[in-house]
């Protein structure tokens, strides 16, 4: 999938023009924050895991890492990240461009409570040089998460 898939996804909500394409690459939260001139914590970081053989995408604030104990308590398994070379096949986006939009139908999406600190966040737009700024309500509405979770390290 690509920025065009994400653009098509948002077209049905008339938000496709909010996807910004940048000259430089923002494939890490640090690069994205520098590119957008915002704080790292305002980047909606998508992390991909395998839970009970299923692909899971968790969106956290950019300044958070996954807490192994919280993850195990939430999902009844230790965190196992999807290998780098399998992310595109399992999720539908390449590493550094993963986003909860225009993903494969079997991916389970969760939003971490660390995002609730902000009015808006910047999510990847389907490529390493595209982003979309969304309010937390918009993120929740369009990402279609199964639930809010608390798996970020304090």
Q: Model-predicted segments: where are they?
A:
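Extended, low-hydrophobicity, polar/charged segments
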Residues: 1-154
């Amino acid at each position: 999938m690509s920025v065009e898939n994400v653009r098509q996804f948002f077209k049905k909500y008339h938000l496709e023009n909010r996807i910004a394409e940048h000259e430089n690459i923002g494939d890490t939260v640090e690069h994205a924050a520098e590119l957008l001139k915002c704080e790292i914590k305002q980047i909606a970081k998508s992390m991909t895991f395998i839970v009970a053989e299923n692909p899971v995408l968790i969106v956290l604030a950019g300044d958070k890492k996954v807490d192994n104990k919280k993850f195990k308590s939430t999902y009844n398994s230790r965190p196992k990240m999807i290998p780098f070379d399998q992310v595109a096949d399992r999720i539908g986006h390449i590493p550094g461009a993963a986003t909860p939009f225009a993903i494969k139908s079997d991916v389970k999406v969760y939003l971490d409570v660390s995002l609730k600190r902000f009015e808006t966040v910047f999510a990847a737009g389907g490529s390493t040089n595209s982003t979309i700024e969304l309010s937390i309500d918009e993120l929740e509405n369009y990402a279609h998460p199964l639930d809010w979770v608390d798996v970020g390290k304090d």
